[in-house]
Amino acid sequence: MIRRFLRLYSIKRNTHLILEDLQSIKFNKDDLKAIDSALKLVTVKQTTSSSKLSRTRAKQEYIDRKLEVIRNIFPGEPDSEYVSMEPPNDLKNPYFDVYSKTVLDEDGNIKFAGTERLSVTKLLTKRWCELNQMYDIYSRLPIFEHRQLKVGKVEHEKLEKAIHGVAPAVEDFMETYEWELAEDDTHQLADNWFQCIHRLLTLFSSGEAREILCHGYIDSRSCQLIEGQVKDDRDILISGIIDHVVLFHVNNNKPKSLEPALREKNGFDLLKIISFLGDTIPQAEDLKIAVGDVKTRPRAIVPNHASVVRASKLQVMYYRFFLENLGKDPEIAYQKLILNATRRDINIDTPINISNLIYFMEIDPAIRPDLERIMLGEPIGFEPFDRYYQSELENGDEDNIAMPSEIGEANEYNLSQYADLTMEESTLEKYGTFYQKWANPPTLRYFAARLAQLYGTLLPLLSNDLMIEYYTGDYKFYTDKFQYDSALLKQECHSSSQFWFGKRSVEPIVPTKKNLVTFCKYCDFHDVCGWRANGNKMFKQLGPTLEEISKL
């Protein structure tokens, strides 16, 4: 009886009770007793703005700043303490009108710098409450770094360093190195791409790798994931970092090396390594690659909120989708990587500082033969890259393919003066050969080329088996294994993209008793959220409403 009764009183998203055809329902004495029991189950403690949670001063100041912004953008009804759920007419599109738009102050200084890309986590709009996410987007404030978030970052770094830590010999060499490393956006991206190349080689030599870059694009018009080439600026960059990639044997699911001596066997030459992988991987029928994410928890307890678990699985599915599409065609992946850089306002043809290149070679000598080829003007064996520099020479633009270096003549990548200015003998012995005029400059194009090729080596091995690993401290207490579902991913991506690109209204959590207690309690917008207030009001009125119905 109670189950039938509760089904009758399900709640719509707009919080109105479904009252159709209730007049035809007649209740006997047993029914009334069941109703009385049900009413005790749905009684909700009314929460008010006075029920303050214990917060640090920094957290409260952060929330106050957000609420001030949100009250201005989403003004509520006159004399109401609650804000509106409808964005103003000139800000209907969260991505184009707010997130990616740079805002200047009265003096022309940047007040909010727009971001012309989304992260995978930004697409998980229903991980918690989409209304909460909408307010966060429009507030344009960064996510508050609470203690558990900081602890999680430290734990992720520990896992990363366990596999990819910098060798002591590299640190010792760099301590004696005389020249500064460049740290601008161009060189940061060069470091990111180099590290990804290095880690993918480690995946094949040791059986696992961490913090692997991936990305894709979404068509903001159709709200669909793009599987081929990118057309224009309405195709939005989506970036992601994969916590854990494992090469495993299909019989025991344990990490398995393809070739432990991968670098040594191929003369520490990336060109030969990629050729070796291309020949060897098709024969490795007993090996697969699993994509996974790492979640850190304060205690050894797996999340029990269905929306949180679902979003975590979707996150890994996005990563799996991106790797598959980047691996289908290295030439298209190469163009997507170059576009990735330009979307970040980075000049893909800015030469990379020799100090950074030396640091890269110290970490992984496998790139050294490639840099020697570039220096001598020889092909590296990847047609789009080689074709670009060949066409520059054929068009008579030899003097313009490099930007001016810090030391050397304008329009040249000429490092000759470094030979005279470098005092450390160990540096000259190892890298003095690079202190000359280069035929071609080393740029981000090189790292994009090799990374695109390595993405291609992953494709034949990608498994539909995905995983989420739960840690508390250094202890992995649970691994949630599940299957890749491309249909579900595309469906969920379409829905979240419709929200981001202003094609549908925000969809808050369903206002059930459990949701209002668990989701709303720690929400930054708890005190100004009309959706929460209406939900609580509805439950408070539910008892009298049912009593009236029972009298029919």
Curated annotation (Swiss-Prot):
Residues annotated as binding [4Fe-4S] cluster: C129, C520, C523, C529
GO cellular-component term (any): mitochondrion
Record localization: Mitochondrion
Co-factor remark: Binds 1 [4Fe-4S] cluster.
A biological process term (GO) from this entry: interstrand cross-link repair
GO molecular function, one term: single-stranded DNA 5'-3' DNA exonuclease activity
InterPro entries assigned to the protein according to its UniProt record, in alphabetical order: Exo5, EXOV
Originating organism: Kluyveromyces lactis (strain ATCC 8585 / CBS 2359 / DSM 70799 / NBRC 1267 / NRRL Y-1140 / WM37)
Function as written in the Swiss-Prot or TrEMBL entry: Single strand DNA specific 5' exonuclease involved in mitochondrial DNA replication and recombination. Releases dinucleotides as main products of catalysis. Has the capacity to slide across 5'double-stranded DNA or 5'RNA sequences and resumes cutting two nucleotides downstream of the double-stranded-to-single-stranded junction or RNA-to-DNA junction, respectively.
Superkingdom as given in the UniProt entry: Eukaryota
Cofactor or coenzyme needed: Mg(2+); [4Fe-4S] cluster
Family the entry assigns: Belongs to the EXO5 family.
Keyword Metal-binding applies: yes
Main localization (coarse): mitochondrion
Protein's name in the database: Exonuclease V, mitochondrial
